């Protein structure tokens, strides 16, 4: 299991959000089945059944060991790398399910719905200083990991209260 950290960095029109207030208030944590992840440049196949599909950019944290109820001060021991990930969402299906007050996780949690880039190894000092620049035509958006609203350590500690994290 990987923990996907962060809110969408761009909307369906590929324009940057004006502010990252949503991220600053609380970082979103998504847990995904192993089959949702594609890595190493493997192709992503979008299912026909979902309708319109949007891509959402996220930050992925690679978990390096098994843990449960991890105190924040020890969280650094449980992850070793970061990557950018593209999460594909079936937005048409998600909207219909939300209107019907039905669970909409299947619109985001299907086989191959998350494509992770190459994980970059971290040192203890690097985590707060990482800056990610997204280039889309002429626009650039900068995301600083320290501006996610919660630190990665805090997110790992929170997630491990509710479920075991593992490699």
Residue ranges: model-predicted function:
Residues 1-166:
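Catalytic-core "active-site belt" of small-molecule-metabolizing enzymes
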């Amino acid at each position: 299991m990987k923990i996907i950290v962060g809110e969408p960095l761009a909307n369906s029109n590929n324009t940057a959000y004006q502010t990252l207030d949503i991220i600053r208030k609380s970082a979103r944590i998504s847990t995904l089945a192993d089959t949702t992840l594609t890595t190493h440049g493997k192709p992503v196949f979008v299912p026909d059944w979902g309708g319109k599909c949007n891509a959402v950019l996220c930050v992925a944290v690679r978990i390096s060991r098994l843990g449960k109820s991890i105190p924040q001060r020890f969280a650094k021991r449980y992850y070793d790398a970061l990557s950018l990930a593209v999460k594909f969402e079936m937005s048409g299906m998600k909207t219909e399910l939300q209107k019907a007050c039905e669970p909409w996780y299947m619109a985001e949690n299907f086989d191959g719905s998350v494509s992770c880039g190459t994980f970059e190894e971290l040192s203890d000092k690097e985590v707060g200083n990482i800056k990610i620049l997204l280039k889309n035509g002429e626009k650039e958006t900068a995301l600083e990991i320290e501006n996610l609203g919660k630190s990665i350590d805090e997110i790992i500690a929170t997630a491990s209260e509710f479920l075991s994290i593992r490699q």
